[in-house]
């Protein structure tokens, strides 16, 4: 396609050895190209004369011919301004009148439909490295431009001056694919009948959040009021907005009779599938047991009646909801949450007998007995495994113990195991007769431990006996040692104005205070444990020896992951060298080092044996 004012270049081929001369398609004759003139000039110039005598005669050259420019026939112009002329490769002229353009194409646009576009590639020079690529544009009805990569072997694009893409794709490419919209999820309605025997409401929906809408008047027993089948509507959860919060409570249409109970509708959001609903007055306890080893969760939903100004009364009967069967027979421990409230009933009280010995020598017996909680409505925000607080009741031989019923519990200080003695003042001794004692030993609570309280001159002592509770055994003193300590405490009573002397040793030889000046070199500290009779020169050695009888090991290794206990401090120091690798004992002959002195002594004997040999 060409305008009459535009020139088209045509190339004529005469022979393989001839030159190519372009010819213009206009009505006037065009001049030869500079390439043709240069070729003709070079052919006319002969070889130099000097070289002609030396060189052999050249072969006969073909006589050059002057190429005549090939001029196409002039295009006859029509009177119309929109006429187009097309020159084909065979020299034929195709002329299209402007009237055809104006009649068929209002915008002056011309579209050529080429039936066989593969004819373009059937030229004489098939190996030419020329490639054309066109990316058409499809203008949609909603003013959106779509870029399409065409297949160059099956389609041709012609773009007029209006920049609108007209494309003729092949039937095998660019097939339209219909896009279907996503299906709209419809709310499913499930009808669950209410059992007449036990008021059980079950949710048949799947996993996820399920919104359960129950009118209040349908929660009563079906056998009593003859209520119809309850309709449960399941709907997908939606985020709470201002309109949703106001729609939590809505009334029924006005066509129904104005019943105050039926107009109030409560919406309960349940997050699991296995639900246990427990009715407790106006509180709904929902026990969720998801299973799979996960702990159950208790949620409390409280039905709040409307304000007095709305003149609506909400009443839920006591038999409205009962316990729904759980997914498993035994529920796991309910974790603690701030909003969870549940009641704990105390077990039957077990009396505990406590003996108190007064300074006058009388022994009083006090029975410590647990009592149930003061108020039945009291709730505890703790887990089910934790013990509840209990108020003690006491009954004793004296009248002053009867006034201790209303007093609060006063726990005693922690008592160390293995017969350690803890000093108590008068206030703590009075509290011991007023409350049940709870002793914490290594994080384990032992209740109802029988104790023996002895009285000295202004100083009270508490000694732990051998007792077993909650699979915990407290290793205390033997009955002989306990009796001996009681005798020592009674014998140590002094007058108020007398000065007491500190006694480092309580063995029989040191207790009487007799000084044996003539036997200073002898061992005077005797072990008072029966059938032992060992004597020691120092009280520290005697105390360390007594720990062997009692089993007490107060020295603990604080090294990581060790925790070994020892009776004596030197044993602990010797053990610590195994961790640090300290070898302080060195052999004087071979400079070999050892951790313990006895090992060095044993090693030194090897040198003596070698020397004697």
Curated annotation (Swiss-Prot):
Task: Name the segments for region: Disordered.
Answer: 1-32, 225-258, 372-404
Q: Which GO terms describe its cellular component?
A: chromatin; nucleoplasm
Quick check: keyword Zinc in the entry? Answer: yes
Report keywords, A-Z: Activator, DNA-binding, Metal-binding, Nucleus, Phosphoprotein, Repeat, Transcription, Transcription regulation, Zinc, Zinc-finger
The record ties this protein, via SMART domains, to: ZnF_C2H2
Write down the InterPro entries for this protein, in alphabetical order.
Znf_C2H2_sf, Znf_C2H2_type
List where Polar residues composition bias occurs: 23-32, 225-235
Give the GO biological process terms. immune response; negative regulation of transcription by RNA polymerase II; regulation of transcription by RNA polymerase II
PROSITE patterns (UniProt xref): ZINC_FINGER_C2H2_1 (PS00028), ZINC_FINGER_C2H2_2 (PS50157)
Question: Which residues are recorded with the post-translational modification Phosphoserine?
Answer: 78
Q: Where are the zinc fingers (C2H2-type)?
A: 525-549, 555-579, 585-607
Query: Motif 9aaTAD: which residue numbers?
Result: 361-369
Principal localization?
nucleus
Compartment list = Nucleus
- Please list the residue ranges that the record marks as compositionally biased, kind Low complexity: 372-389
GO MF term list: DNA-binding transcription factor activity, RNA polymerase II-specific; DNA-binding transcription repressor activity, RNA polymerase II-specific; histone deacetylase binding; RNA polymerase II cis-regulatory region sequence-specific DNA binding; sequence-specific double-stranded DNA binding; zinc ion binding
Q: What is known of its domains?
A: The 9aaTAD motif is a transactivation domain present in a large number of yeast and animal transcription factors. In SP2, the motif is inactive.
Q: What does this protein do?
A: Binds to GC box promoters elements and selectively activates mRNA synthesis from genes that contain functional recognition sites.
Similarity field: Belongs to the Sp1 C2H2-type zinc-finger protein family.
Q: What name goes with this protein?
A: Transcription factor Sp2
């Amino acid at each position: 396609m060409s305008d009459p004012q535009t020139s088209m270049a045509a190339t004529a081929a005469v022979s393989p050895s001839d030159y190519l001369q372009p010819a213009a398609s206009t009505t006037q004759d065009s001049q030869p190209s500079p390439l043709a003139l240069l070729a003709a000039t070079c052919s006319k110039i002969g070889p130099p004369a000097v070289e002609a005598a030396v060189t052999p005669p050249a072969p006969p050259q073909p006589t050059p011919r002057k190429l005549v420019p090939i001029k196409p026939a002039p295009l006859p112009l029509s009177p119309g301004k929109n006429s187009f002329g097309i020159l084909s490769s065979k020299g034929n002229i195709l002329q299209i009148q402007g009237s055809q353009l104006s009649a068929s194409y209002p915008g002056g646009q011309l579209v050529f439909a080429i039936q066989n576009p593969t004819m373009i590639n059937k030229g004489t020079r098939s190996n030419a490295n020329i490639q054309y690529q066109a990316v058409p544009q499809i203008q949609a009805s909603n003013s959106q431009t779509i870029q399409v990569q065409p297949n160059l072997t099956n389609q041709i694009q012609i773009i007029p001056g209006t920049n609108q893409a007209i494309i003729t794709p092949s039937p095998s490419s660019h097939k339209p694919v219909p896009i279907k919209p996503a299906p709209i999820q419809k709310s499913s309605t499930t009808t669950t009948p209410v059992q007449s025997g036990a008021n059980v409401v079950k949710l048949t929906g799947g996993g996820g959040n399920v919104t359960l809408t129950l009118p209040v008047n349908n929660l009563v027993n079906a056998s009593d009021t003859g209520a119809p089948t309850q309709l449960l509507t399941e709907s997908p959860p939606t985020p709470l907005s201002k309109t949703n919060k106001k729609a939590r409570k809505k009334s029924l249409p006005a066509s129904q009779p104005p019943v105050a109970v039926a107009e109030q509708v409560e919406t309960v959001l349940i997050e699991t599938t296995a639900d246990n609903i427990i009715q407790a007055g106006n509180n709904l306890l929902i026990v969720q047991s998801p299973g799979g080893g996960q702990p159950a969760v208790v949620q409390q939903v409280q039905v709040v009646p409307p304000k007095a100004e709305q003149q609506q009364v909400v009443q839920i009967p006591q038999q409205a909801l009962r316990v729904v069967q759980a997914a498993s027979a035994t529920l796991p421990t309910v974790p603690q949450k701030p909003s969870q409230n549940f009641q704990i009933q105390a077990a039957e009280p077990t009396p505990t007998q406590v003996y108190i010995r007064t300074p006058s020598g009388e022994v009083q017996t006090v029975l410590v007995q647990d009592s149930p909680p003061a108020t039945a409505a009291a709730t505890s925000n703790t887990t089910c495994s934790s013990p509840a607080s209990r108020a003690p009741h006491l009954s004793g031989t004296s009248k002053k113990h009867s006034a201790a019923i209303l007093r609060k519990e006063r726990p005693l200080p922690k008592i160390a195991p293995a017969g350690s003695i803890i000093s108590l003042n008068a206030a703590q001794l009075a509290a011991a007769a007023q409350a049940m004692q709870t002793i914490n030993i290594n994080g384990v609570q032992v209740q109802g431990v029988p104790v023996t309280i002895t009285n000295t001159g202004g100083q009270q002592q508490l000694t732990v006996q051998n007792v077993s509770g909650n699979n915990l055994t407290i290793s205390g003193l033997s009955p002989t040692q306990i009796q001996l300590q009681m005798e020592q405490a009674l014998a140590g009573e002094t007058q108020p104005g007398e000065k007491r002397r500190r006694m480092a040793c309580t063995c029989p030889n040191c207790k009487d205070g007799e000084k044996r000046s003539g036997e200073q070199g002898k061992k005077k500290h005797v072990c008072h444990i029966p059938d032992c009779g060992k004597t020691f020169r120092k009280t520290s050695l005697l105390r360390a020896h007594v720990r062997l009888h009692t089993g007490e090991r107060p020295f603990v290794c604080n090294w990581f992951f060790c925790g070994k206990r020892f009776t004596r401090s030197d044993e602990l120091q010797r053990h610590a060298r195994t961790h640090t690798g300290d070898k302080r004992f060195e052999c004087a002959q071979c400079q070999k080092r050892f951790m313990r002195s006895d090992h060095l002594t044993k090693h030194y004997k090897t040198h003596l044996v070698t020397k004697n040999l």
